[in-house]
Amino acid sequence: PIAACFTAFSASKELEAWLSRAHEARGAYDEKLDQKLRVAAIGIRARGYEVTLRTQAEAKLTEALHRIHSAWSLAALDEATSQFQYDLCDEYYHLDRIDPKANYEVSTVSVPIFAYREVPVLCFVAGSFDKTITGSQIEEIASRMKESADRVTRLAAGQETVA
């Protein structure tokens, strides 16, 4: 489920490859996971940005990274991130619909930057929300980030200059 903000704007071939990697990480095809990830990608593309929620998988990853911090190794890092991706597939991670009045425990808001391409070349990401935020706050944050992302795209395409 990682990198959905990039995948949502990619060609169908890349979307299918992303879905296949998710199934491979789980060891077998999972219809429910497939539908969940497809809905997430459709929502991200329609809305123009990705919202991820705080999860137990994220908390476990943070703990694992703290444990290996002083005795860092590639094998331990690979194990921690693989477990994170595996666990994430079991949780409600991508916010599909935003209710302006509801409160959400947001992990990240990601807005794609297209620059001169049809697919994102990078994303602006806001994270480290330590309190719940409302759907309307998410929309406001994303709107401001999108304005900046659109400006970077115009600058990269030569449609605007730095003043």
Go through the PLM ranges and name each one.
Residues P1-A102:
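Short, solvent-exposed recognition segments
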Residues T108-R117:
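A short, hydrophobic, proline-anchored segment that marks a local hinge/packing element in signaling
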Residues L77-S107, P120-A163:
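Juxtadomain coupling helices with adjacent low-complexity linkers
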